Amino acid sequence: MGDVSVAVSASEVGKGSAENNATFIDKKNEVKKVILNGDKGIYQCNFQNDKCIDNPIKIGESMFEDAFISPDTGLAAGQVFIGESVDAYIYKLNAEAENDTKITAAWKSIPYQKYIPKMGNYDIKKSYGNGKIKSYHGYLFHGKYITLREGGNILAGMNAVTLGIPYDEFQKASGALHAGGILGLIRHKTTGYTYGTHPRYGEIDYQYLRSKYGYDFKIKNGARNSTYKK
């Protein structure tokens, strides 16, 4: 589907049933509403008083139905860049990880800093915008829309495979960082302490499911193979 627009007939959606679909954007491509019901479609329409007032147009699908809901606030957020892809950008960063040590990869994975060489390069919610935070800006990846926050988690999973890190080890570190910050990560690395149980180890689904997708995708294609099959 991706960037192909599909008109949704009134019998399929219409003004009344439009509220029962998933992700809605306005004519500026800004996310206005997300309803979690298993429909990953992204629909565009005119909004008035937080309601869709005409027949929506399906412009694509999200990879995950809650892509445009901030896990921090529970609110819909973001903007969809229709037809724009980050496949090549994510693949390029993953290829870069082939020359990283684990320490270098960790340096590139912490929050991006524009004027510090390579710091946070893999934090694509900021690095993609050269320092401007774009956590919930949505772009195509594998033909589905993801946010840059999701993209960073997918990349992290891919990089873990490239670096030869078992998924459980990777996830324990991610959970420690999420739950305890840098000090939590240090505690985990020095004592083995974990901040939750298998398989999330203290992380949230917005990280876990996306990183698992990236990890499994990279396993399928080979740790150091840059010719990808979806």
Describe these PLM feature segments.
Residues 13-158, 162-175:
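Glycine-rich short-loop/terminal segments
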